[in-house]
Amino acid sequence: MIYSVYIIYSKSKDMFYRGHTSDITDRLIRHNGGREKATAIGLPWLLLWCTQKSNKSEAYRLEMKLKNLSRERLIEFMLKYEDDIAGPDALLFLKQWSGC
């Protein structure tokens, strides 16, 4: 089964959330529907970055690595793996954040 590792952002809370899931569409609906405790505040959440892993343990390991990065390092990471950025708006947002 394929798992997605993703990073979402809340402008209202100015915070990032990192997670993994087997169904990214459903997970984003749950985040933006206030049905996830960790993200119930801070709506709406914008998908910035998403990649796929071949199994749950790989996805979990990457999620834990991402959770240990500072905000600056997290943005650098997303820009380094630009192919996984979720569209031109997300790319522009990240480049503005990084000062590029």
Model-derived regions, located:
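GIY-YIG nuclease catalytic motif and its immediate N-terminal context
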Residues: 1-53, 57-67, 72-74, 78-100
